[in-house]
């Protein structure tokens, strides 16, 4: 099934590229044309549908679904929950993003092992990730809503400030930080334009469209994956899955993106 899904997604990418040929010659943003065409038949929707099925499936040692998972608005209430994350959860006494909250519920409600979950959290060409699919489904339930990440709890504020510090801090063997690539307009790596995350409009366009389908990966990815890869590209120490660092950076970026209308899954290169 995963190979078939990957093949279908790749075929859709090729169709979109072919359909965009004439438009590319006239556009200043050829990759944007492709993304727009893909969004009409988004391969990422396959992950959303899988996530919906997995969410309601009786799974794990406890043979339970995730219908009692509380994403901040009450057990089982998904509409608008993603728009307010990361946020503080009293039961864990932590600020959590959607993925870390999903893992908490999979452990507590379904009896899964946290370490084992992390081993298969990121999908491959041969295997779709349940976590990535679940994150896409939960996020999709906030589509059309504005991001409204809170800072009302002290730990929410502390996490936000930690994320802000990390975003602007340069370190490691290359003296890189998030700000190195995402602090100015008109930067790019090969074919990839780099958004200026100090520009509110550009930042909102980014944070409101993750999780996203990546054509180069033939897979759907989450912000946890994106930040992990950023750290790898900066030659910094590997970030463990659901690291406090990734949650902190996500908290900073999502709060800065408040007011952006969510539309997931996005489509990226």
What kind of region is each of these model predictions?
Residues 36-53, 145-164:
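Short, charged low-complexity linear segments at domain edges
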Residues 25-46, 57-71, 75-133, 143-144, ...:
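Electron-transfer interface patches adjacent to heme c in soluble/periplasmic c-type cytochromes
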Residues 14-23:
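C-terminal segment of classical bacterial N-terminal signal peptides
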Residues 5, 152-153, 265-269:
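Short alpha-helical "patches" and their helix-cap loops
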Residues 1-9:
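Bacterial N-terminal signal peptides that target proteins for export
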Residues 134-141, 150-151:
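Hydrophobic, well-structured mid-protein blocks that either form specific transmembrane helices
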Residues 132, 136, 157, 161-165, ...:
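Internal, well-ordered alpha-helical scaffold/interface segments
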């Amino acid at each position: 099934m995963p190979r078939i899904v990957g093949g279908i997604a790749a075929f859709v990418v090729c169709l979109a590229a072919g359909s965009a040929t004439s438009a590319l010659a006239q556009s200043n943003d050829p990759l944007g044309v492709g993304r727009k065409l893909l969004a009409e038949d988004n391969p990422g929707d396959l992950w959303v549908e899988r996530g919906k099925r997995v969410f309601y499936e009786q799974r794990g040692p406890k043979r339970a679904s995730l219908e009692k998972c509380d994403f901040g608005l009450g057990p089982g209430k998904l509409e608008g929950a993603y728009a307010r994350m990361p946020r503080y959860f009293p039961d864990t006494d932590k600020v959590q993003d959607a993925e870390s909250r999903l893992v908490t519920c999979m452990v507590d409600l379904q009896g899964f092992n946290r370490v084992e979950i992390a081993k298969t959290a990121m999908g491959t060409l041969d295997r779709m990730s349940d976590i990535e699919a679940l994150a896409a489904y939960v996020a999709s339930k906030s589509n059309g809503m504005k991001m409204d990440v809170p800072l009302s709890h002290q730990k929410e504020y502390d996490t936000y400030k930690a994320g802000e510090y990390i975003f602007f801090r340069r370190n490691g063997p290359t003296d890189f930080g998030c700000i190195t690539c995402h602090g100015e307009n008109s930067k790019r790596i090969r074919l990839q334009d780099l958004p200026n995350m100090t520009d509110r409009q550009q930042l909102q366009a980014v944070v409101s469209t993750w999780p996203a389908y990546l054509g180069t990966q033939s897979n759907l990815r989450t912000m946890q994956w994106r930040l992990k890869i950023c750290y790898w590209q900066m030659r910094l120490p590997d970030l463990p899955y659901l690291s406090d660092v990734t949650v902190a950076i996500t908290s900073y970026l999502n709060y800065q993106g408040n007011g952006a209308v969510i539309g997931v899954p996005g489509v990226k290169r």
